[in-house]
Amino acid sequence: MLFDQIARNKRKTWLLLLVFFLLLGLVGYGVGYLWLGSGFGGLILALVIGFIYAVTMIFQSTNVVMAMNGAREVDEQTAPNLYHVVEDMAMVAQIPMPRVFIVDDPSMNAFATGSSPKNAAVAATTGLLAVMNREELEGVIGHEVSHIRNYDIRISTIAVALASAITMLAVMARNMMFWGGGRRRNDDDRNGSSGLEIILLIISLIAIILAPLAATLVQLAISRQREFLADASSVELTRNPQGMINALLKLDNSAPMQHHVDDASAALFINDPKKESGLQKFFYTHPPISERVERLKQM
């Protein structure tokens, strides 16, 4: 079961790469067509940027994501309780000891990152460490270690990298649109406009507007099931479903994180760091806590 899941996650990695690079190419084509005079040139440029960004994130994901979230690295002397729990869970999961980080934030949350178990890291907020008891902390850390063991982190890291690149290009395009930075067309261009050019213009605008949303939806599609799997895998490691249930119930009552969390990296956290309401709740990267608890009760 576990090895089948790891194999599926590896296949999903390549599928995600294909989908995200397709979205990236559409945005690049739109930017190139509208502002550079060459849709194909913009497409190539966007793919090159996205590839470099993705490779950088994959091989430096730990440092990049930790820096994005203001995390500081700790050791056995500076944070013994957290360090020992991470050490215990890693030992049970039979993975190398991850690096350990703390985020100075009063909310309760945690996340893991790294492209493979060999270069992974786990982070917890000061709020989580202040509220959770040992059994609950083991449940939370077991959840994050399970993400590492199941290679979920690689999928999330690629999603974070490419979604960020797509959003960056789309925002740049919208800013150029707002400030009137589009390519100038001469009289011959205007007189020679064809139906094809109009279609390309419409496609370019739609790509720029909708690609970030599409990237978010792809992240949603892969994020929710991996949360259920990590909850169950945590119980497999701790042999204590009630500890995980109690931890989730406390997380459900946590306030939003005070420091800014990048939209692309929000999916890495065990609990939604923004606690958004209204229409935004339909774009949660996490399944409802109540549903996660019910699934654990059925184990």
Swiss-Prot record:
It is an enzyme of class 3 (hydrolase). It comes from the Bacteria. GO terms for biological process: proteolysis. Pfam families: Peptidase_M48. Zn(2+) binds at residues 143, 147, 227. Disulfide bonds: none annotated. Its EC number is 3.4.24.-. Keywords: Cell membrane, Hydrolase, Membrane, Metal-binding, Metalloprotease, Protease, Transmembrane, Transmembrane helix, Zinc. One of its GO terms (molecular function) is zinc ion binding. HAMAP family: Pept_M48_protease_HtpX. This is Protease HtpX homolog.
